[in-house]
Amino acid sequence: VGYFTNPLLNYSDGQQRVDKKPFITRWRLEPKPEDRERYLRGELVEPAKPIVFYIENSTPSRWRKYIKQGIEDWQAAFERAGFKNAIVARELTDSMNVDKDDVNYSVLTYAASTKANAMGPSILDPRSGEILEADIMWWHNVLGMLQEWITVQTGVVRPEARGVRLPDELMGDAMRFVACHEVGHSLGLRHNMIASWTFPTDSLRSKTFTDRMNTTSSSIMDYARFNYVAQPGDGVTALSPHIGPYDMFAIEYGYRWYGKETPEAEKDLLADFLSRHADRLYKYSEAQDVRDAVDPRAQNEDLGDDAVRSSLLGIENLKRIVPQIIQWTTTGEKGQTYEEASRLYYAVINQWNNYLYHVLANIGGIYIENTVVGDGQKTYTFVEKEKQQAALKFLLDEVLTY
C-alpha cells in the first residue's frame, strides 16, 4: 500500500547496523472514548479530532466550491475506515482567529504565479509518523495546464471542451481533482502509477463501465488525467478522474482503528485485510520517470492496460483535433494572432509524444511485483514477446518514416 513512511532509527549494542523501523505517515484519527464500542461494532462515528483544511481567502472565489468538494471527496474513503465527517474544508475569513502561518492550522493557499503545479507537504512527528499539520499550495497557471489537458484529451467528444476559455463548471471539475490529489498526499498517500493499468482499455470506451467507476483510474493518486481513449460515438460522459477503489482501500488500511496497544498487535489484522483485497484494482507501484520506465504498467499520463491500443485510440482523437485548431482558437477577428492556436498545437504534439513513450516502455520492459517471502510470486517478469513485438510495430508505423 503506497504510504509515505518515516523511519524510526534504532541504535543498540546488539546490532551490527542501524535498524530502521518505518512507520506510515498519517493523521491521528481515533473515535471518542464514548464511541469506541460503537465504532468496533461497525457503526460510523465522528473522530475525536477531525482533519480540517482552511481555504485561504486569496483563493479566487469562483474555484472555492470546487476545491472544497475536492477536499471533502475523501469523506467517502474515511467512511470505509469507520469515520464520518473525518475531513472537512472551511473557507478562511478575516473574522476567524486563524493565522494561516500557524502550524496548528492546515491551509490551502493560492499563489499568483506562472508556475503550473500544486503540492501538498506536511509536518510530522518523527517519533511516530503522525501528521501534525499539512498545507496545500497551488499556483495560478495550473489552470492553463488543466485547460490544455481538457481540450486535447476530451475536446473531440465534448464540444464544451473546445475554445480559448472553457466553462467554469468544466475547469472547476478539474480543480476539484487537483485539490483531491494533493489532499491525498497530505493524508500520507504516495503516487500510484499502476492504478490506470487496472482499468481495461476497451472498458474506457464503455458508458456503462465509466458511469459506474466515475473515474479514469482506480486511484486519484495516479497521474491519469482525462479519458483520451473514448471516441466520438461511444457516448462516454464520465471523463474526469475522481477517487477510486484503490483510494478507498488505502485509506481503510491506514486509518481503520483497531484499539490495539502496539503496531505489532495489528499485524495479523492488517495482513488479513490485505489478503481480502488481492484484486488488481488494489495494486500499487511507485512512480517511475516517463523517459526510462522499467515497468510499462506504471507510467505517468497513461490510461488502460494496453498501451498500444490506448495510444492508437488517443492518436485517432489527435488527428481529429489538428484540422480544427484554428476554428477552436480564433474568432475571425481581424488582427487576431495565432498564439492560442500555437499553444494548442504544441499541446497536441506533447500528448502524441506521451503516447510514444507509453508504448516504448514495453520494449525490454519488466513487470515488477511487490513480493514478500512465501507469497509464491515472481518479483521480475519480462513483458511478453507478443506485446514487445506489437510495441515495435506501433513505433515503426506511427513514428518512423521510410
Which residues make up each language-model segment?
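Auxiliary tRNA-acceptor-end handling modules of aminoacyl-tRNA synthetases
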Residues: 1-59, 77, 86, 92-145, ...
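Soluble non-cytosolic domains of exported or imported proteins
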Residues: 18, 57, 61-69, 169-174, ...
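Short conserved micro-motifs at the rims of enzyme active sites and ligand-binding pockets
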Residues: 39, 65, 147-148, 230-236
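Zn2+-dependent metallopeptidase catalytic core
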Residues: 58-86
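Sec-exported extracytoplasmic/periplasmic mature domains
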Residues: 72-83, 184-185, 189, 226, ...
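The catalytic-center signature of Zn2+-dependent metalloproteases
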Residues: 91-111, 173-231
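Extended catalytic-interface subdomain
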Residues: 119, 124, 130-138, 176-187, ...
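Conserved catalytic/binding loops enriched for acidic/polar residues
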Residues: 196-402
